[in-house]
Structure formats: structure tokens, C-alpha cells
């Protein structure tokens, strides 16, 4: 088996000076994974006796790209504390795979390097498969948090997410949330 993984992440933050407490953050990520598996079982492999050797090859590759951007605001005015967030996120994943299995080799010498010479291929018994998949996810989100005197708390958030994995008639969805809190021990 052979595995290769590559990845890179970049994060940048920009404090917007004219407005105290406002900052813009960005995150970019790329990840690539690929592997190849080659297996050969000789004529004498105990559970495969009579197959005249069996060869198996599988290749897989996946690329994943992500981007997220947020605008954050945080400030305190006397006993009032406010935090607000607006953001966007994007993710795209693309993968491919292929595999093949064949048996019935005259010799064990070539192993997986001449997989087409096995007799199961000419007899229609060899196994081959391939697959391609790509998925996209996009989200827009916002959150507002209010705190008065560290006693009374309010939080509200709203997301609008779209995904290629959602149902055909529901590619986008709204996801709201609200919470209220009271720290009774602060009274």
C-alpha cells in the first residue's frame, strides 16, 4: 500500500481600527489524500487454493477545499456586553476510486503488475468498479449575544445552509436558535 496526504491551512485576522471591537477573520484549507493498494495471493494461499492466484488493485483520491470568513464585533458599554458575528463558509469535496480483482494466473511472478492476464477476466468473472463523488456545502450564518451585568443573557442565531447532499427539493434550509439565561446566583 502507498499513501500520500498533503494539507495546507491559512488563517488571517484583520482588526478594523476605525471601529473598536470589529475584526475580520478568514480561514482557507486544502487537503489532498490519495492511496493505492496492491495485493496478490499466490497459488498456494490457504483460503484461495484452486483460484490460481488472485490479484487486487485499488486507487483512491480525495480533494477537500474549505473557506470560512467571519466578521466579529465585541464591545462593552457599562453593564452591557454585545457580541455579533456574521459569516460565510464553503466546502467542496471531490473523490474518485477504482478497483479491480482478477484470478487464474499461470504464474505468480507478475503479481499485480499484469492483472489483465488472469483467466477470470476472459471468463467474465473478474470484478471491476469505479466511483466519483463530489459534494458542495455553503453556509451563511449570524449570531447576536447580549449580556446585561453578567446576570441576564440573550443569544440568537440564524443559519442558511445549502448542500448537494440535501434532498432534491430541499437543497437549502433555515436553522434558527434563540436562548435566554438568568444567572440567579448573581442576584
Where are these regions (language model features)?
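Structured, solvent-exposed acidic/aromatic patches
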Residues: 131
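Glycine-rich, aromatic-flanked loop segments that form ligand/cofactor-binding clefts
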Residues: 90-94
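A generic secondary-structure boundary signal that marks alpha-helix termini
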Residues: 95, 186-187
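Surface-exposed loop/turn segments flanking beta-strands in extracellular/periplasmic regions
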Residues: 1, 38-55, 96-127
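Surface-exposed extracellular loop regions of Gram-negative outer-membrane beta-barrel proteins
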Residues: 4-77, 81, 135-186
